[in-house]
UniProtKB/Swiss-Prot annotation:
One of its GO terms (biological process) is tRNA threonylcarbamoyladenosine modification. This is tRNA N6-adenosine threonylcarbamoyltransferase. PANTHER family: TRNA N6-ADENOSINE THREONYLCARBAMOYLTRANSFERASE, TRNA N6-ADENOSINE THREONYLCARBAMOYLTRANSFERASE, MITOCHONDRIAL. Required for the formation of a threonylcarbamoyl group on adenosine at position 37 (t(6)A37) in tRNAs that read codons beginning with adenine. Is involved in the transfer of the threonylcarbamoyl moiety of threonylcarbamoyl-AMP (TC-AMP) to the N6 group of A37, together with TsaE and TsaB. TsaD likely plays a direct catalytic role in this reaction. InterPro entries: ATPase_NBD (IPR043129), Gcp-like_dom (IPR000905), KAE1/TsaD (IPR017861), TsaD (IPR022450). Its EC number is 2.3.1.234. Its cofactor is Fe(2+). NCBIfam families: gcp_kae1, T6A_TsaD_YgjD. It catalyses: L-threonylcarbamoyladenylate + adenosine(37) in tRNA = N(6)-L-threonylcarbamoyladenosine(37) in tRNA + AMP + H(+). One of its GO terms (cellular component) is cytoplasm. CDD domains: ASKHA_NBD_TsaD_bac. Pfam families: TsaD.
Length: 354
């Protein structure tokens, strides 16, 4: 069964072909990053128009890569939401029109579910059940995943998502758009503990997270540096140090909350998905993760247990059509009914969890 996947929720146009017998056959992606850089952020109208221009050429490119034709497509999956309304509508219109013309089913996919399942595209795949950390510009959530369609939301950010905090902090530091990736790059040259920022909610008993206060702490540090130097410019090394301290704080919070989720569920496998999943520091920290079951005072400590951690291939951390094609194929196999034309710019993840 060959499924065409279409992703158009924000500023990447992704098209891919996934074969339920042979795996991923083709994957094409166009990013609008350069177009939006001039404006310092995504312009929804420009994003929508660019999706319209790119969808047909990308589809034909995928078919050529796979040595397939339109007639070989068995189903069309598309991102129904959440995302930018106009951008979603561009993908939905194309997917539904193509499916109608081919007389094939169309499968709506929740964008976050696509990210959630993207590590299953890797050669080394996790087994169910696992704890999933969805960490991107729009969402930071921890979930218990027991199978396709069997998800339980355990905790999430109560304010800014981690990726959003990266981007806003980068803008505060005067870094060019898109700033999150640049901040991570500069953090590599930062000195450890030159700055120390708070780890919001790291010791709370629940799995909720908060990053807006961390952003405020960075602003306070930046204003202090500028006042001491009597200039708006921040010395290069100081800026790098701030980037490192910020990144370390975010990763520490994410790691602490995921460890708590592992202890709560009893799972020993973690899947990290979403754009921030490409962050080197996060991958390094999670790659060395262990958990230790708490013991009563005076009792011998339990030995640390190694955790198996899985990341999607770097190409599938950001928005892409491959994850949508795969998620659509999985739902088609499990009997999900074909969907409708409508899009859902605001689609709470709670509506797809059990």
């Amino acid at each position: 069964m060959l499924v065409l996947g279409i992703e158009s929720s924000c500023d990447e146009t992704g098209v891919a072909l996934y074969d339920t017998e042979r795996g991923l056959r083709a994957h094409c992606l166009h990013t609008q990053m350069a177009m939006h850089a001039e404006y310092g952020g995504v312009v929804p109208e420009l994003a929508s128009r660019d999706h319209i221009r790119r969808l047909v050429p990308l589809t034909e490119g995928c078919l050529a890569q796979a040595g397939a034709s339109y007639g070989d497509i068995d189903a069309v999956a598309f991102t129904q939401g959440p995302g930018l309304g106009g951008a979603l509508l561009a993908g939905s219109s194309y997917a539904n029109a193509l499916a109608f013309a081919l007389d094939k089913p169309v499968i709506p996919v929740h964008h976050l579910e696509g990210h959630l399942l993207s590590p299953l595209l890797a050669e080394e795949k996790p087994d169910f059940p696992f704890v999933a950390l969805l960490v991107s510009g729009g969402h930071t959530q921890i979930m218990a995943v027991r199978g396709i369609g069997d998800y339980a939301l355990l905790g999430e950010s109560v304010d800014d998502a981690a990726g959003e905090a990266f981007d806003k902090t980068a803008k505060l530091l005067g870094l060019p758009y898109p700033g999150g990736a640049k901040l991570s790059e500069l953090a590599e040259s930062g000195r450890p503990e030159a700055f120390v920022f708070p780890r919001p909610m790291i010791h709370s008993d629940d799995l909720q997270m908060s990053f807006s206060g961390l952003k405020t702490a960075v602003l306070t540090a930046v204003e202090k540096v500028r006042a001491e130097n009597g200039a708006d410019d921040i010395p290069e090394q100081t800026r790098n140090d701030i980037c490192r301290a910020f990144q370390d704080a975010v990763v520490d919070v994410l790691a602490a909350k995921v460890k708590k989720a592992l202890l709560q569920t009893g799972f020993r496998t973690v899947v990290v998905a979403g754009g921030v999943g490409a962050n080197r520091k996060l991958r390094e920290t999670f790659g060395n993760m262990t958990v230790q079951i708490p013991t009563p005072k005076g009792k011998p400590k339990h030995p640390s247990e190694k955790v198996s951690v899985f990341f999607p291939p770097t190409a599938y951390c950001t928005d892409n059509g491959a994850m949508i094609a795969f998620a659509g194929a999985m739902h088609l196999k499990t009997g999900r009914e074909a969907g409708a034309f409508n899009v859902r710019p605001r689609w709470p993840l709670s509506e797809i969890v059990k």
